[in-house]
Amino acid sequence: MNRRQFISKSAAALTLAGIAGQDAMASISAKPNRGRIGLVLYSVRNELPKDFEGTLKKVSAMGYSAAELFKINDGDFFGHPLKEVRVMLKDLGMSITGTHTGSGVLPEDINAPEWDFWKKISEYVRTVDAKWAIQAGFPGAKSVDDLKRLSAHFNRVGQVCQKNGVKFAYHNHHAELGKIEGEVILEYLIKNTDPKYVFFQMDMGHTVNGGGDCTRYLREFPKRIPLWHASDFDAANRKYTWLGKGSVPYPALFDLAKSSGLEVLNVEQETLENTLEACKSDFNYLKQFKWTKA
């Protein structure tokens, strides 16, 4: 932490100036960025309201080739129509991989009106030429029976999404590494959902925070975890940090990337201090790994 703060304070001005200086190049190039590293735009949630297009340009100039959205339940993203966001990012050389969203447990009958939510979300995902609708967080499970109902619900969500042209995934936080009646929540959900309909987006930092072994999950559940959130957690100091400075074993994870079926890699920067500089550092850390090359 002290070392990072020292570096960030001494280099922040130069780094951000360099990013800003690349804005013009990013704005006039419609060619896709090289590589396979995306950014969860939740990472820059404080910057987007201040300068939406300018922030996206800075992200593109860092080298990111894709973005993940969030809070599009009303058909827009920070007040911008989704079609406009899609075009804006495409002009910056970036695609959209999917969005975070979510609902509580809905009626078993997928023709019930409550299921219009997931049909609408699927339409929004298609509107931005993306593939994934991702639920982040589980509704108040307190027993194994609750987990059983939740698993059945996720199966139905996956079916509805698939019928509407997108795929469904569940994103874990550290809480899902806890146990209910002796069952690790995340493992129960993976084992008791249908692999045809339900996939998982593993947040690496949250998994380590919860005491989980990311590499074990990739080995034991191949093809079930095609999406990664690249975040980092310093287990010794109990805090989220920049990629490569924490306890997530990324070299070992990327050794398993192909065999585990990794499809989508998005950085999620959990810290809010020097966010743009952190996102640039995260990109530079990940680009050393062979999988990230186009």
Region locations from a protein language model:
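Acidic-and-aromatic substrate-binding clefts and catalytic sites of carbohydrate-active enzymes
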Residues: 44-50, 70-81, 104-115, 139-148, ...
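Acidic (Asp/Glu)-rich catalytic clusters
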Residues: 31-32, 56-61, 78-97, 117-129, ...
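Active-site acidic/histidine proton-transfer and metal-coordination neighborhood
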Residues: 10-12, 21, 107-200, 276
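A short, structured active-site edge motif that brings together acidic residues
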Residues: 98-104
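N-terminal substrate-binding region of glycoside hydrolase catalytic domains
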Residues: 64-78, 100, 134
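Histidine-acidic metal/acid-base catalytic patches
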Residues: 4-19, 25-38, 44-56, 60-62, ...
